[in-house]
């Protein structure tokens, strides 16, 4: 194999993934002598293609599993997808609607065929995207939440929970989505502030003597009112408790009752009670044995209980009802009112509180079990730790979970009703006399099945299955903090309840991927980025490295094309350094030829030490999920130290005549680059495999090579300190050259003065580095040098770098040039100061623009101070 002159990600990545999969590198070894490491992929919905959030999620998971595989663990990274009930059904219904067909037109069976066809199409897209990202998944174990194995687990859990009293069927107020025509759980409702109205109406007393004032934001629900309540301690209403009022329009008599729930400070202090359309009213209705009158149907239209408004949309009814009340002089006032209104997370429809018979999970005992577990040694480790408080708080305030959905796509509830007696049968299989029973048509909330994901995918409820025994509990869950309640919490309490173990050791939570300006990515804003477009432009390795290292745990990530491009430049730097190294190592040099036992130069010892320090740092940081810090450590070592310094230093022996020294340099280049590729591999799998295959190595793929370990034999602390001092000296020389505008191509005298005999000896022994990088016409290293009158000086530790300026530059011209430059920076400072002191600008300009101006000021001030210091030094 030969490395091309230029890095081309398309060429590097082509065919590589298929080879990895076909050769089975991602399959767990099953070696019983090895410790296991398992991650189950958070199953993406089959509603569409993957977005950047998925790419971030899976990149972190792949880094962890690739690293653990290299560290000798029996590693399983299990793929799978979620049927995503309401979301997928909505997509397929929309597709049918475009053809003028509804699901009811074609029936349940035919509709489900359409959904399965959709699922197959989008599952194929998702697998293609996983491949493009380079994810080390074991496809032999791929799962889908509607697979028979997972469906069996769902049925068993439902039946067991029902038998334990943890699942019950009851009539309660639930969140109803009139567009999807299904119940929703509390966390599927998004509350948004809406500019609405607060309507104040007269409810006349039945005896004809006056009225009581009632305020509401939802006038259409008054058609279902069955009482008025006031606080028993409210002096204004003590005399009317027990009286009756007439419900306008309907003319139904309503009793006035006392209930402590009423807030005397809110509105008029009197409250209408609509038990079928408000959760608080429902509780009041239960206490006072009130009738519950449902006035809407499942589409949000008024039903026959709404009288003349029957058939109207709820909001149309609201407008008409208010007009009718105005005609009867029953409207006191209408106020503007901003209030939080629940919307369906999936359809965006305004959610209707609705009295309905549904299936519920009794959450109190399950939440208690999860909270108690966090006080034991078996507790789940949240990263960052602050999210444990978020989890605990939600569990402490949890309400029962509505799990039935009025959909067709999903796990049909394993409950049957006797056709004659109405008796309920709940079982994993249908009743023996199935012809006498009818199965509940509803399906389970998607999150019910995905809550079982960590163990149902590994063979549960067959607790003797090999995968369940070996790979459960899993080691880490990596997901966004936005689904702690939807998914993470449910996996925890389901796992504890049914396996007796925590489903994972650690939960690593990342934030959201945002646009460059910090706004959330969305279709409506048109600021979304397709990860496949990024991969086609810059390669998977560039995207992966950016996603992995661009943020710290728990924080959002701002997508930046510029930053992805800078990673691409980093990979180019690695590519070029590797090409140079491989060309100089030569085809004849083999892995077994590496010999680091003798003749190591100072630079060799330094880079070997820094390699081992970086291996330790990267290993420790990865174990703590500090991927951003890993990125900095790798960049610093690879770009700043290996590429910029060691590669250049290696040219000294490689261009020399000493063959033994050349062989040592080949050994060091091979050793360092090969281990660096292994260390970088989990982050950049494609380019590291390409380079590794061209290096002397052992084994057939970097995927299954060993993670590099720290080798104490190649840790040379004194040599490292010495080399770092040499580098600082060279940097000081370069800085001084820059300040007097003297290019490296021009040889100049360089003096280094130090009183430290050991430093002098070390510099004497390593003059070749100073000569190569400083380009001196004369190099003097001494304990006793008299500094010339005209010279640039720079203190470096226990030494001083001196550049005599006599004859080197025209001092007067240089000072004049610098004074012009300082005038330029002063005028820039004046301009930006004027802008920032302008109150009109500061008050009206966007924060981003103001911050940009402040950054400019800081930059100009630094440049001004630097030039000023150079002028003063030259004048001195």
From Swiss-Prot:
Motif ('HIGH' region): 44-54
Pfam families: Anticodon_1, tRNA-synt_1, Val_tRNA-synt_C
Disulfide bonds: none
E.C. number(s) listed in UniProt: 6.1.1.9
Record GO terms (molecular function): aminoacyl-tRNA deacylase activity; ATP binding; valine-tRNA ligase activity
Record Gene3D superfamilies: HUPs (3.40.50.620), Isoleucyl-tRNA Synthetase, Domain 1 (1.10.730.10), Valyl-tRNA synthetase, C-terminal domain (1.10.287.380), Valyl/Leucyl/Isoleucyl-tRNA synthetase, editing domain (3.90.740.10)
Alphabetical GO biological process terms: valyl-tRNA aminoacylation
Catalytic activity: tRNA(Val) + L-valine + ATP = L-valyl-tRNA(Val) + AMP + diphosphate
Motif placement: 'KMSKS' region: 520-524
Protein localization: Cytoplasm
Residues noted as binding ATP in the record, renumbered to the chain: 523
GO cellular component: cytosol
Coiled coil: 805-876
Function recorded in the entry: Catalyzes the attachment of valine to tRNA(Val). As ValRS can inadvertently accommodate and process structurally similar amino acids such as threonine, to avoid such errors, it has a 'posttransfer' editing activity that hydrolyzes mischarged Thr-tRNA(Val) in a tRNA-dependent manner.
Domain notes: ValRS has two distinct active sites: one for aminoacylation and one for editing. The misactivated threonine is translocated from the active site to the editing site.
Family: Belongs to the class-I aminoacyl-tRNA synthetase family. ValS type 1 subfamily.
Protein name per Swiss-Prot or TrEMBL: Valine--tRNA ligase
Gene: valS
């Amino acid at each position: 194999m030969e490395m091309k002159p230029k890095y081309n990600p398309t060429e590097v990545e082509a065919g590589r993934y298929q080879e990895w999969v076909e050769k089975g590198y991602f399959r767990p070894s099953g070696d019983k002598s090895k410790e296991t490491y398992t991650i189950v992929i958070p199953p993406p919905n089959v509603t569409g293609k993957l977005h950047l959030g998925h790419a971030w999620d899976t990149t972190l998971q792949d880094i962890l599993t690739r690293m653990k595989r290299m560290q000798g663990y029996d590693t399983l990274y299990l793929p799978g997808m979620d049927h995503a009930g309401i979301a997928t059904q909505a997509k397929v219904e929309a597709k049918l609607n475009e053809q003028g067909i509804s699901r009811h037109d074609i029936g349940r069976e035919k509709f489900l065929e359409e959904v399965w066809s959709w699922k197959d199409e989008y599952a194929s897209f998702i697998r293609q995207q996983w491949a493009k990202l380079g994810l080390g998944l074991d496809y032999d174990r791929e799962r889908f939440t509607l697979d028979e194995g997972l469906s069996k687990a769902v049925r068993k859990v439902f039946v067991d929970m029902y038998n334990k009293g943890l699942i019950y069927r009851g009539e309660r107020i639930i969140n109803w989505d009139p567009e999807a025509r299904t119940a929703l759980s509390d966390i599927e409702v998004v509350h948004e502030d809406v500019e609405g109205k607060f309507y104040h109406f007269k409810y006349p007393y039945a005896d004809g003597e006056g009225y009581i004032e009632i305020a509401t934001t939802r006038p259409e629900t008054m058609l279902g009112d069955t009482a008025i309540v006031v606080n028993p301690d409210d002096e204004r209403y003590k005399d009317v408790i027990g009286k009756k009022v007439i419900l306008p329009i309907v003319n139904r008599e309503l009793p006035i009752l006392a209930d402590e729930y009423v807030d005397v400070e809110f509105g008029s202090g009197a409250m209408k009670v609509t038990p079928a359309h408000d959760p608080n009213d429902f509780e009041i209705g239960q206490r006072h044995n009130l009738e519950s009158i449902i006035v809407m149907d499942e589409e949000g239209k008024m039903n026959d209980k709404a009288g003349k408004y029957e058939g109207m949309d709820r909001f149309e009814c609201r407008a008409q009802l208010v007009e009718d009340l105005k005609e009867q002089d029953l409207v006191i006032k209408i106020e503007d009112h901003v209030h939080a209104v629940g919307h369906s997370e999936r359809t965006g429809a305004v959610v209707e509180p609705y009295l309905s018979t549904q299936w519920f999970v009794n959450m109190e005992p399950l939440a208690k079990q999860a909270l108690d577990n966090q006080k034991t040694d078996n507790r789940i480790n949240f990263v960052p730790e602050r999210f444990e408080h978020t989890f605990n708080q939600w569990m402490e305030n949890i309400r029962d979970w509505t799990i039935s959905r009025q959909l067709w796509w999903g796990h049909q509830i394993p409950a049957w009703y006797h056709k004659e007696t109405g008796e309920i049968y709940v079982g994993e299989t249908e009743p023996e006399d199935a012809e006498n029973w009818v199965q509940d048509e509803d399906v389970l909330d998607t999150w019910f099945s995905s809550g079982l994901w960590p163990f149902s995918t590994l063979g549960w409820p067959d607790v003797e299955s090999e995968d369940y025994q070996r790979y459960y509990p899993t080691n880490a869950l990596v997901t966004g903090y936005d689904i702690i309640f939807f998914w993470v919490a449910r996996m925890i309490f389901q796992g504890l309840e049914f396996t007796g173990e925590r489903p994972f050791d650690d939960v690593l939570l990342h934030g959201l991927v945002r646009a460059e300006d910090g706004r959330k990515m969305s279709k409506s804003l048109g600021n979304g980025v397709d990860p496949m477009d990024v991969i086609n432009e810059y390669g998977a390795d560039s995207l992966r490295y950016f996603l992995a290292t661009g943020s710290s745990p728990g924080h959002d990530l701002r997508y930046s094309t510029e930053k992805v491009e800078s990673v691409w430049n980093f990979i180019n730097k690695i590519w070029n350094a590797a090409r140079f190294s491989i060309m100089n190592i030569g085809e004849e040099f083999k892995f077994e030829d590496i010999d680091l036992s003798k003749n190591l130069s100072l630079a060799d010892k330094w880079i070997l030490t820094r390699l081992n320090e970086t291996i330790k740092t990267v290993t420790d940081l990865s174990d703590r999920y500090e991927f951003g810090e890993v990125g900095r450590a790798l960049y610093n070592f690879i770009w700043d130290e290996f590429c910029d310094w060691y590669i250049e230093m290696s040219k000294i022996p490689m261009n020399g005549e000493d063959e033994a020294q050349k062989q040592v340099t080949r050994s060091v280049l091979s050793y360092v680059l090969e281990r660096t590729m292994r260390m970088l591999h989990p982050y950049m799998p494609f380019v590291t495999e390409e380079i590794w295959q061209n290096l002397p190595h052992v084994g057939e793929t970097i995927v299954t090579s060993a993670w590099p370990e720290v080798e104490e034999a190649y840790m040379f602390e004194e040599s490292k300190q010495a080399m770092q001092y040499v580098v600082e000296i060279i940097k000081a020389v370069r800085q001084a050259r820059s300040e007097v505008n003297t290019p490296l191509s021009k040889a100049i005298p360089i003096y280094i003065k130090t009183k430290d005999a050991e430093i002098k000896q070390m510099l004497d022994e390593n003059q070749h580095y100073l000569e190569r990088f400083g380009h001196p016409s004369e190099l003097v290293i001494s304990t006793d040098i008299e500094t010339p009158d005209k010279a640039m000086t720079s203190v470096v530790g226990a030494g001083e770098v001196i550049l005599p300026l006599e004859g080197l530059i025209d001092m007067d011209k240089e000072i004049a040039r610098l004074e012009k430059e300082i005038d330029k920076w002063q005028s820039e400072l004046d301009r930006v100061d004027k802008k920032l002191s302008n109150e009109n600008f500061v008050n009206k300009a966007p924060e981003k623009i103001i911050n940009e101006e402040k950054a400019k000021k800081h930059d100009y001030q630094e440049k001004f101070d630097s030039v000023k210091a150079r002028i003063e030094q030259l004048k001195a």
